[in-house]
Amino acid sequence: MSDSDSENKQTTTTATSVTQRLLLSLKEAAKIIGTKGTKIQKVRDDNNVKIGISERKERCSDRILICTGSIEDVSNAIGDICEILLSEDVVTNDEDSNEKENDEYNSIEDEKFVYPFLNFRLAKPTLDEVNDAETLKKIINIRVLVTRAQCSAIIGTKGDRIKSLIENRGVRMIASNQTLPDSDERLLEIQGTSMAITKVLEDINAVISNEVRATREKRYVPHVRRRNQPVSTNTSSNTGSSKSFDEEFKSIVKIPEAYVGAIVGRQGNRIANLRKYSKTKIVIEKRASEVSDDAERIFEIISNDIKNVELAESMLKKNLETEIQRRKEMEETESA
């Protein structure tokens, strides 16, 4: 990136005003507000942003956090919100919530909701995947509300932009295909550390600011659905299953070029068996005409069931680890 590009990006992140909207559960909202509003006020003061949470509606299980300011300030504020949600302290005497105070505030991420849009689709990674217990504790999921136009800009042509954001910032992301009830907004779920989420939000908001014009798309407002209105087209929303017939879940695994052949197997048999067992589609990036063994190829896993995607991802990584260990042992044997 040139000096002028860096200066332009810095100017954009500091000068352009943006508004970020997050979907929250009641418990998340109460935890962010804090005792007598002290926590959300600190976020407001520390980051020089306008931030608030929508009123709690009777018989509604969700609320909206709205944050406005410069791209940098808003992104940092959302990072602070992530830190609040990760904290283990319990909300007490919250004047904005009638919920009974208890330790359930400490297990927000494990809660299952009747309202399907509140249920996270990205499962928390395992210790084997992260390889660091402290980092694992710092990983969190958030639900960002985006319009159709914004979502298209974030995904990019053939998904190139969202892939780049995932790779460059070390996060996982899923954009839902369906809109929230009575609106034109969709959910962009982001998983990562607070710092990684802050950085990717800077990138996302810069894209939206530079490429998406103001539209009249209808924003989502928490409300009680009409009696005959379906909750969701996701047939598994009340069963705890992750399967959705109108959503597509994706994940990317990078495999060093030197190991691609072993992972794919002779005549593609090994990867074919993995596809069949995990019930996923696995798209392998084409090999460049000239590439070194330390280069990486992208294996993109696709399914309408997030559990299948996670299974395939885990199996791919395990196969890679096994092959690396096998070659290491062969080298030690030969050198002995």
Swiss-Prot record:
GO terms for biological process: chromatin organization; mRNA transport; regulation of translation. Residues 17-81, 139-204, 248-316 form the KH domain. Gene3D superfamilies: K Homology domain, type 1. Belongs to the HEK2 family. RNA-binding protein involved in the correct localization of transcripts in the cell. RNA localization is a widespread mechanism for achieving localized protein synthesis. Involved in structural and functional organization of telomeric chromatin and regulates silencing at the HMR locus. Keywords: Chromatin regulator, Chromosome, Cytoplasm, mRNA transport, Nucleus, Repeat, RNA-binding, Telomere, Translation regulation, Transport. Disulfide bonds: none annotated. The gene is HEK2. This is Heterogeneous nuclear rnp K-like protein 2. It comes from the Eukaryota. It comes from Vanderwaltozyma polyspora (strain ATCC 22028 / DSM 70294 / BCRC 21397 / CBS 2163 / NBRC 10782 / NRRL Y-8283 / UCD 57-17) (Kluyveromyces polysporus). It is found in: Cytoplasm; Cytoplasm, P-body; Nucleus; Chromosome, Telomere. GO terms for molecular function: RNA binding. The keyword RNA-binding applies.
